[in-house]
Amino acid sequence: MWSLALATLFVLGTVIRADQCPPVPADTKDKLEKILELIGHVNRPLTPETPEPAGYDETKLKGLGILPQHEIFSLFDERTWPEATKAAEFLMEATDFEHFIQRADVLRHRINEDMFMYALNVAVLHRKDTRGVQVPRIHKIYPDKFLKQDILVEVREKVNHGEEKPVVDATELHQNQLDPNYRLSYFLEDIGMNSHHYHWHVVHPAVWLPKHGPRKDRKGELFYYMHHQMVARYDSERLSNNLPRTEPFENWDDPLEEGYAPHLTIHKTGYNYMFRPEGLIVRDLPELNKNKMRQWKSRILHGIHLNVLYAENGTKISLDNEHGIDLLGDAIESSLLSVNRAFYGNIHCYAHVMAARIADPDGRYGEDNGVMHDVATSARDPLFYRWHKFIDNIFLEYKDNLDPYTQYELTWPDVVLNDVTVKPHKGDYDDEVHTYWEVDNYELGKGFDYTRKTTATVKVRHLQHEDYHYEIDIDNNAGKAKKAVFRIFLAPKYNEKGELFPVNEQRQLLVELDKFVATLEPGHNVIERQSKESSVTMSKDHVFGEIRNLADDHQCSCGWPDYLLLPKGKYEGMTYQLFVVATDYEEDHVEDAGEECQCRDSMSYCGSVEHKLPDNKPLGYPFDRRIDGTGFEEFKTQNMYYGDVVIQFTGETVTH
């Protein structure tokens, strides 16, 4: 007996279809319009200003208005955290939606615009009465953080010459043989990828405390895993472009090999993100020196080797298998949930600040900070990935201290995974997927310094892949129907020298492609899963679409852009290996995860806004721990599969 099953969009706690989610409140679009009216002034000097509401109780505004308007708000600089926390609380504590709008209008006139947008995003995502409301993504509010200065100057010139709704072509890829990293500009400077990084930090604010709402389940682990995946994806892109994998940042006193020129300017304020020439050395800041950073790292590693962290009162907190990675994530990020911020410090965030101020650490020259200072721009810089590989290696130290999974733990006796085939929707080939360039329209609204009273369109080019599906051949020998969780990963097969990767090097490069639930009938089953259904990604509509068309969506869309699901590959084809693992849903699902309709997309990287992460397994399972033996074949159990997949870049450009 065999059956064909089509896998559905899922949450491990409960399988949820869109038609099972409660309807979005009828007033959602009205609420969106009120929010759009508020933020229509942000970063738009030519939008007519409204007067500040009068008569508000000034005592409730104490501590707000400290960060100057012309500065960039940095979530990495903890000196801004008290004000950012106060701003978010001010909006979160509003008694109803009308009160929320009143408070937001007051706040907008009082605090730094960049900070206001962050606080507003956090509040809208987490308030009960704004569920279903989709605030415009950060790249719609600040195009100047995502488009280079010369593009926006061209837009302004066309507007100044009287063009209505001008169109600027930003798709031409300039060759720069002097900077090898320029080959990666399609990835580093991708609008959706950088917007994803910002939005992840909105869903999981470093300043979040339990008093603001439910504790963020596994937030520290999600911090580790999402950034680990970003680094793994970056390394895959480097190998696709015949570049070696990025080296971790190691020595605070070594010159940095990478320079970076962002060519980004905030037109309203004139803020110009700093250029960093190669060869600079990270220097002490007035408020923090490099020795403190070394000390924080040493204390964290000491805790890993002892398998404990020390709380502020001196209590030992075990870094056990279940919660250890989560505790470490909160301490390393660090967030306000760290068990002991005074002792373990803020190593991740302050490294961003040090890198951003590398050319003017004490401010004597009045330079603006570099892109590493800003959550919305930091992932553009190659140094971001060197730094996060350094952070990743600290987490790896902890993971390598854990016992490897045993064959007993890995095996699902009821199931045999026979084969997996990757089938493109067009073409007569299997286990091969083609990538290419795609051109989309990035729409700029009215009121910016460069658009004035008209709208404008910038044509941008991004990577894309052909649609495909997985065909999974699997036997269920339990004698009754069983639910399976399928976990799908991809990694390059060969290193930069053309040699097979050692298994523990390769597992560090595994990127998650999907995680889903399907029912296995007794006997033989063939499961189909579409690439577009990935639990990792968000639709490109959230990057290039119209916000009003998304107002009735149940998605919070914190995920990876769907068009970057696969790495670029090579013209001649590049061999990757696909890893698929089937595990028992009954063991994996979380009973009290709740029906999370609001954020049923992007669950793998982003988790849940207010419920438990609906998967009992560690993120990245079963490749999150070291593998003993010489290869995957020794590790593999009957419920696992691996095989070669070729990704070929065609070089074609498709315009929509």
Swiss-Prot record:
Subcellular locations according to the entry: Secreted, Extracellular space
Binding site for Cu cation A: H197, H201, H227
PROSITE patterns xrefs: HEMOCYANIN_1, HEMOCYANIN_2, TYROSINASE_2
Tissues in which the protein is found: Hemolymph.
Signal peptide positions (record): 1-18
Residues binding Cu cation B, per UniProt: H348, H352, H388
Keywords: Copper, Disulfide bond, Glycoprotein, Metal-binding, Oxygen transport, Secreted, Signal, Transport
Keyword Glycoprotein belongs to the record: yes
Disulfide bond entries: C558-C606
Location (main, coarse): secreted
Classification via InterPro entries: Di-copper_centre_dom_sf, Hemocyanin/hexamerin, Hemocyanin/hexamerin_mid_dom, Hemocyanin_C, Hemocyanin_C_sf, Hemocyanin_N, Hemocyanin_N_sf, Ig_E-set
Keyword Calcium attached: no
GO molecular function terms attached to this record: metal ion binding; oxidoreductase activity; oxygen carrier activity
Pfam families noted in UniProt: Hemocyanin_C, Hemocyanin_M, Hemocyanin_N
Origin: domain of life: Eukaryota
Glycosylation sites: N313
GO cellular component: extracellular region
Family, as annotated: Belongs to the tyrosinase family. Hemocyanin subfamily.
Subunit structure: 36-chain polymer consisting of 6 hexamers, each of which includes 4 different chains, A, B, C and D.
Stated role: Hemocyanins are copper-containing oxygen carriers occurring freely dissolved in the hemolymph of many mollusks and arthropods.
Protein name as catalogued: Hemocyanin subunit A
Native organism taxonomy: Eukaryota, Metazoa, Ecdysozoa, Arthropoda, Myriapoda
